[in-house]
């Protein structure tokens, strides 16, 4: 790359998305100057943190909201294929970072864990069986197992079967090649690698407070050093806003037209965590149920084995809790400051359109620990209050926007890339399955905003992500080859012995 092509990039936020994009960019454009600013004192403290992340290892293996029943009764698995491919892309990039020595000890951030779906009730059992039949036919999911036999379920999920009798309708499906991912640890590893890289500057306790567009087309970014209160400005070619819940207010400060007619509604996640090691040891899976009728996808409960600080833990949730902060370490004025003359009708229209969601949120806010425990007992009937404690996880800011297709006040689920017309400002908005698909999101950012570099960068990207430019959905042989390679690179051990 010629020196005349050298650019300067500012990354805002040291979460999984910024550190992923930064890690990728420093490899494909090593001469570019990258400056990462994080207002907290270390990386991965907000939504990427392992105690704040609402769901880990999203691969559409057990999350039932990615497989939707159609009016004719058939099951559409297209979204599940897409999510699974994106997770396979993420695993390739992480494997590359391990193989290249940029990060070490993959077991500190990813571990094998069965992914299981569990349902009760006649209609739900039929849905799960139909889903199994649809997924079994597709090579990406042909290792799925299904049972309605309670004795088999006792082997898969012994803790959840305690106290259950062999009556009523119950079913479960299982894919053993699932994982638990500690995105906090992964983020910390990538941030440290960035800090050790040439042409990269990582600054903690530095808050981006404003932007100004300059006549030369660059941006002047105003940054406050929270250690001493000093404010300075940095000129840059590109601004990347990967600040989680803080992305919308920062995007609004740029003043770009694309920041208008969108807003956000903050939702906290609450979990109940098991404190009894004897109970924790009896569960070894990520188990998802089905959302209650008439509730949004975010309401899907799950009982998860997780690895935090090298120890096995057990969490159940999430339960929503509404508050005005956009970040866990944010301000109670965040929501109110984000309401502008240009987006107030968007937010009001959303409120009118989404009364069931508002009712659900209110019901969740007033839920006590007893209510949480009652939900848990639908998964684990013998759960005792004294073995569990409630804790507040991270924030998600649900994006609300106007679209031609859905009109004003449409709630956008998932992760979305927003950029200025000239591609100098790029912001990542949204939530689940954000962290799990972070590498695909970073690739989307590159493809949408740096098309003039695509030809030069493609060979470097393919070295990091061998399936880049090809379909793991359509190419079965490639998909199986990639899975075996990432299992080896990440020390998952999925294919070490024949089934």
From Swiss-Prot:
<protein>
    <recommendedName>
        <fullName>Probable malate:quinone oxidoreductase 4</fullName>
        <ecNumber>1.1.5.4</ecNumber>
    </recommendedName>
</protein>
<keyword id="KW-0274">FAD</keyword>
<dbReference type="Pfam" id="PF06039">
    <property type="entry name" value="Mqo"/>
</dbReference>
<comment type="pathway">
    <text>Carbohydrate metabolism; tricarboxylic acid cycle; oxaloacetate from (S)-malate (quinone route): step 1/1.</text>
</comment>
<keyword id="KW-0560">Oxidoreductase</keyword>
<dbReference type="InterPro" id="IPR006231">
    <property type="entry name" value="MQO"/>
</dbReference>
<keyword id="KW-0816">Tricarboxylic acid cycle</keyword>
<comment type="similarity">
    <text>Belongs to the MQO family.</text>
</comment>
<dbReference type="InterPro" id="IPR036188">
    <property type="entry name" value="FAD/NAD-bd_sf"/>
</dbReference>
<keyword id="KW-0285">Flavoprotein</keyword>
<dbReference type="GO" id="GO:0008924">
    <property type="term" value="F:L-malate dehydrogenase (quinone) activity"/>
</dbReference>
<dbReference type="GO" id="GO:0006099">
    <property type="term" value="P:tricarboxylic acid cycle"/>
</dbReference>
<dbReference type="GO" id="GO:0047545">
    <property type="term" value="F:2-hydroxyglutarate dehydrogenase activity"/>
</dbReference>
């Amino acid at each position: 790359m010629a020196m005349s092509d050298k650019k300067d990039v500012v990354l805002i936020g040291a979460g999984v998305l910024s550190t992923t994009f930064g890690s990728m960019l420093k490899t494909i454009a090593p001469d570019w100057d990258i400056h990462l600013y994080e207002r907290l004192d270390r990386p991965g403290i907000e939504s990427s943190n392992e105690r704040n992340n609402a769901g880990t290892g999203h691969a559409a293996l057990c999350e039932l909201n990615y497989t939707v029943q159609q009016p004719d009764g058939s099951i559409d698995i297209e979204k599940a294929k897409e999510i699974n491919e994106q997770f396979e892309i993420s695993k390739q990039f992480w494997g590359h970072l391990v193989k290249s020595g940029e990060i070490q000890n993959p077991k500190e951030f990813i571990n094998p864990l069965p992914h299981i779906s569990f349902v009760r009730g006649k209609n739900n059992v039929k849905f799960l069986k139909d889903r199994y039949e649809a997924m079994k036919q597709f090579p990406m999911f042909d290792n799925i197992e299904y049972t309605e036999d309670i004795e088999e379920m006792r082997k898969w999920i012994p803790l959840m079967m305690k106290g259950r009798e062999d009556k009523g309708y119950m079913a479960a499906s299982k894919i053993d090649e699932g994982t638990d991912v500690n995105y906090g640890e992964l983020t910390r590893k990538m941030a440290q690698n960035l800090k050790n890289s040439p042409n990269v500057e990582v600054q903690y306790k530095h808050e981006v407070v404003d932007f100004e567009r300059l006549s030369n087309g660059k941006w002047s970014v105003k940054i406050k050093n929270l250690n001493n209160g000093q404010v300075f400005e940095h000129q840059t070619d590109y601004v990347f806003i990967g600040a989680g819940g803080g992305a919308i207010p920062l995007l609004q400060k740029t003043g770009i037209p694309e920041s208008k007619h969108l807003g956000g509604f903050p939702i906290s996640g609450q979990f109940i965590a098991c404190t009894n090691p004897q109970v924790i040891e009896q569960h070894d899976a990520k188990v998802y149920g089905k959302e209650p009728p008439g509730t949004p996808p975010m309401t899907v409960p799950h009982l998860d084995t997780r690895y935090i600080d090298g120890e096995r833990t057990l969490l159940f949730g999430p339960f929503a809790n509404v508050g005005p902060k956009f970040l866990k370490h944010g301000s109670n004025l965040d929501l109110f400051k984000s309401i502008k003359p240009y987006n107030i009708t968007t937010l009001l229209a959303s409120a009118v359109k989404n009364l069931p969601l508002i009712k659900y949120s209110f019901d969740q806010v007033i839920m006590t620990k007893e209510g949480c425990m009652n939900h848990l007992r639908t998964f684990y009937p013998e759960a005792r209050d004294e073995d569990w404690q409630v804790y507040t996880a991270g924030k998600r800011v649900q994006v609300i926007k106007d679209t031609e297709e859905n009109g004003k006040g449409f709630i956008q689920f998932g992760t979305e890339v927003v950029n200025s017309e000239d591609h100098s400002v790029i912001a990542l908005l949204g939530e689940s399955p954000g962290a799990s698909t972070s590498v695909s999101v970073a690739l989307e950012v590159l493809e949408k905003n740096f098309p003039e570099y695509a030809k030069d960068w493609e060979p470097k990207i393919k070295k990091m992500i061998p399936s880049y430019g090809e379909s793991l959905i359509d190419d079965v042989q490639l998909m199986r080859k990639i899975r075996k390679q990432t299992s080896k690179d990440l020390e998952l051990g999925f294919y070490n012995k024949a089934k």
